[in-house]
Amino acid sequence: MAASARPVGVGGERATSFAMACSLLSRYVRQNGAAAAELGLGIRGEGEAPRAAPGTMSLLPGEAERKKETMELFPQSAGFGQQDAITADSAADAREQEPEKRQLTIFYGGKVLVFNDFPADKAKGLMQLASKGSTVAPQNAVAPAPAAVTDNTKAPMAVPAPVSSLPTAQADAQKPARANASDMPIARKASLHRFLEKRKDRLNAKTPYQASPSDATPVKKEPESQPWLGLGPNAVVKPIERGQ
């Protein structure tokens, strides 16, 4: 009995010694929590807060943005908004590329020519071409021959050369010029003769006396013929005297 009780006592002593060792270890860990953490036992001290797990630093920040996928709840391709915006932008670009057009009016040969929606650059080229030409056109100018229209299916037609009428026009213009040059002295002499005659008449009318008595023209006196009540030309009219 005594032998059997001894081992029981020995086991109880072992259990108590192990419990004491555990209690001492836990007390030590609580008191020295930093040292236990360094050992990596997973035991923290009494006043120590739980530590967050260390995170990894990404050396390529663009990878996270690539992985993000956005979900479009209102896609524009399903409606008409994006298409209308594209058409409006294309129309604005076309307007910017298209040259400005205005109305062009040309006065030529006594006629008025009006062209609508004429490009501005072509109008400038036309003005430069007109300024290069002669400023004074001849009176009998030859009309330009129409340009020949070439057609691949038909044989080319020969355009007749225009007959110039400038030599005949110059000859006709020289004839009256020569005639006027020959008539100039005669016309001047006639006008000078008329002027001298008028001047002579004015001088004769303004002279206060005659140059000689022979030059004086006799003045013919006509008998007085004053009829008085039908008595004839020789009737004598006596004045009537009023009595006082």
UniProtKB/Swiss-Prot annotation:
Signal sequence bounds: none
Species, as recorded: Oryza sativa subsp. indica
InterPro entries (alphabetical): CCT_CS, TIFY/JAZ, Tify_dom
Entry's family note: Belongs to the TIFY/JAZ family.
Recorded GO CC terms: nucleus
GO biological process, one term: regulation of jasmonic acid mediated signaling pathway
Chain intervals with Basic and acidic residues compositional bias: 194-204
Entry superkingdom: Eukaryota
Domain Tify positions: 97-132
PANTHER family, per database record: PROTEIN TIFY 10B (PTHR33077:SF140), PROTEIN TIFY 4A-RELATED-RELATED (PTHR33077)
Domain notes: The jas domain (185-210) is required for interaction with COI1.
Region annotation Disordered: where it falls in the sequence: 193-244
Cellular localization per UniProt: Nucleus
Record PTM: Ubiquitinated. Targeted for degradation by the SCF(COI1) E3 ubiquitin ligase-proteasome pathway during jasmonate signaling.
Function, in words: Repressor of jasmonate responses.
One Pfam family hit: Jas_motif
Entry protein name: Protein TIFY 10b
